[in-house]
Amino acid sequence: MTAVQATGLALRYGRTTALEDVSFTLRTGVTGLLGPNGAGKTTLLRIVATALPADGGSLRVFGHDPSTPPGRLAVRRLLGYLPQDPGFHPSFTAFEFVDYVAILKELTHRATRHTEVARVLSAVGLDDRRRSRIRTLSGGMRQRLALAAALVGDPDLVILDEPTVGLDPEQRLRFRELIADLGERKTVLLSTHQTEDVMSLCQEVIVLDRGRVRFEGTPVELAGLAAGRVWTSAARQAGALASWRTGTGLHRHVGDPPPGAALVQPSIEDGYLTLVGVVTEASAVAGGTR
């Protein structure tokens, strides 16, 4: 079943084009939204989450048109949204924060609402921290708390804006496990700078650059864009689209290889860089685009 159908979405801020002719389809599973800073990822997520209207194009979420008041209300009842800034009130406890979100989501019956709050806190592993003040929680716990708030009401569409940013490796792994489980049952759209998130989580990936969709397909297809265009050498080579020194001391290059180059298997990051990036003399960081 098609969860989200976007056709020709556009948005301008004065003379600045934020999005132009953006089209894509979302179904059950996890879709990653990759792109450099300023590509329009957060803007696009906010449009899908009905927090921002588009200037042009059409959007349907489970058949509803969010450009109309009835459609917007219907969509909001079907989605959960984790923005980059969840709007925590530091004096709230974990339970109080999620309970507040549940009230905003129209769960008015107190006993039913508290049962739902307990359910989502348990789902993200925070059942034993429900009475903790938010200011006492670690960064990873706060991210899980924000996810719990997004899951109130068991939404069919979950939108996550860079959910793993700022997490240490262990926290990132736990968060990915939660998202992967969601993707088995829900439609999940997440923005990320981490190609490792895409490799470990996503069935589909969209690459956005300068407000336009540059790619829509599977992670394997994204990596395949760099087939025959990735090689390594002992030293930097001029003329490569992207070139960086790896942890092994070798330089990895993306572009048009010279004769006799030592070609290697392309990664998702290589495919991404083929589309949007120029990297020179940068150290490779596992799972990240540089």
Briefly describe each language-model feature range.
Residues 158-162, 167:
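Catalytic Walker B motif of ABC-type/P-loop ATPase nucleotide-binding domains
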Residues 147:
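Hydrophobic anchor residue at the start of the ABC signature
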Residues 4, 57-68, 74-75:
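Conserved ABC transporter NBD signature motif
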Residues 99, 103-106, 111-129:
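Conserved ABC ATPase "signature" region
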Residues 1-21, 27, 69-71:
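A short, flexible loop at the N-terminus of ABC-type nucleotide-binding domains that lies
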Residues 49:
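Helix-to-loop junction immediately C-terminal to a conserved catalytic motif
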